[in-house]
């Protein structure tokens, strides 16, 4: 899984993994949402089994994430709320 040490603002964020996996010839990414605590440093563990396959934001029925196919990662705010945000990321680890 992915372990994040961060300080948040109480909003929900999405961790995205890009992979070599394909769906109809196009690259599949895997998303997992996580909540933050306003103003508190804390650790978030996201098990690989918690990542959902997506293509351009649309949920797919498969395939399950294979950690050996991960090619990149990123962080998104995808809660559809306008306004400022404050997320401080201290570390990212795989476990």
Residue ranges and their predicted role:
Residues 1-59, 69, 83-88, 93-94:
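Extracellular ligand-binding interfaces
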Residues 64-72:
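Eukaryote-biased detector of low-complexity, proline/serine/threonine-rich segments
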Residues 75-82:
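Short beta-strand-plus-loop segments that form exposed binding edges in beta-rich domains
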């Amino acid at each position: 899984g992915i372990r994040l040490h961060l300080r948040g603002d109480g909003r929900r964020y999405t961790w995205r993994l890009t992979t070599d996996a394909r769906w109809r010839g196009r690259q599949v990414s895997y998303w997992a949402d996580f909540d933050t605590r306003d103003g508190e440093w804390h650790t978030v563990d996201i098990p690989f089994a918690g990542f959902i396959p997506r293509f351009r934001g649309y949920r797919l029925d498969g395939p399950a994430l294979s950690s050996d196919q991960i090619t990149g990662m990123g962080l998104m705010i995808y809660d559809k709320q306008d306004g400022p945000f404050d997320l401080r990321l201290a570390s990212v680890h795989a476990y």
